[in-house]
Amino acid sequence: MGYIALFESVTHENLRECVETEDLVLFVVNEKKMGNIFKRNPNVVSVLKERINKHIIMAEASRDLLTMTRNLLFRYGVREIHINWKEGQTDIQVSVAPEEIGRVIGKEGRNIKLFREVLARYFPVHSLSVKQ
């Protein structure tokens, strides 16, 4: 069973996007649907992790870049987000707790690349960086 079909069968919600890496699956759900998912099944992340055998990240989509960035990195305890628009390019700097920086960046920068890639699908994002 594919990840999208599995997600939709477990959550009973349509999925907006699914992105996979070696050890992680990122599910992006439609706006205002995350609450419904957790009301029906509070253990949805555990169920998906058990069936897929990879780390699971769920994020709620948004039409607003700031909100989408916060939703995508929510589990890492986002403190601040700075967005610079310059000459048609958008650069984002995210501040997280010092102990979470390694997890946000990921092994060989995989996680931060994945997050930037997902944001770039919805917004004209040039770079995404993490600071203390």
Question: What function would you assign to each model-found segment?
Answer:
Residues M1-Q132:
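RNA-contacting regions in translation and RNA-metabolism proteins
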